[in-house]
Amino acid sequence: FGISNFTILHTNNLDRGTFICNTLDIDPTVDHAPRRKDILTLPEKRLALQNALRYFHPEDHAMLAPEFANELRDYGRIYMHRLRPTDYEMRAHPIDTYPAKCRQAAAIMLMIQNNLDPVVAQFPHELITYGGNGAVFQNWAQYHIAMGYLSQMTDEQTLVMYSGHPLGLFPSHPDAPRVVITNGMVIPNHSTQDDYERMNALGVSQYGQMTAGSYMYIGPQGIVHGTTITVLNAARKYLNRDDLAGVTYVTSGLGGMSGAQAKAAVIAGAT
């Protein structure tokens, strides 16, 4: 688990050793995202391929373009499964094992890998942590480049992320954020479901939910507090009581986030 796993070239093209020999097989032992909507026109599909290939040296485009075109056809997205790391376990490792120049960067690397841990993530190989579309990155190239930047970053630099795309390391100072993240920066007039599907398929926008694209997913515990307050206020408003003692609370919410409902109900006194 060394720095070579995250090394990138200064041109921002991925080191060929990262992907040339990697597996192309889809792992059947984990859940996978459903096929996304086929919404792109033919010119837009060409643009999606161009956007995906920007991460690679031009010499490799002829090899990768057909493969990425097949992913776009089969899955509705270009995930770059070839680049999924298989030489180390995807999980939150002890912070001192990360090849980083500052501890904050190591912590962020740890958080990213926790979000992509198969035990944690909903569709880990499609980089979806929760909610069906809560993405950490849009593709595995972005993962490698971001981890490479984090391994190089000092406490006088800030990494800027735009919907999974690493814009680069910028000079800052120790009191500045180590990472500035935006996801789904779209104005309301262009934010329909089809707009999202199109822009995500093009590789120019992603939906990071609240804690997937910000690298800090902690499951239902992250919303237990707010859910408890909501349940208590519902009791006050509709039942004219201060808690749910003696009330049977029925919910189908038992998933990664909605599981907070059962916990909140118990905290509020329900049975």
Which sequence ranges carry the predicted segments?
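N-terminal ligand-binding/catalytic initiation module
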Residues: 1-226, 236-242
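Glycine-rich phosphate/ribose-binding loops and adjacent secondary-structure elements
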Residues: 213-271
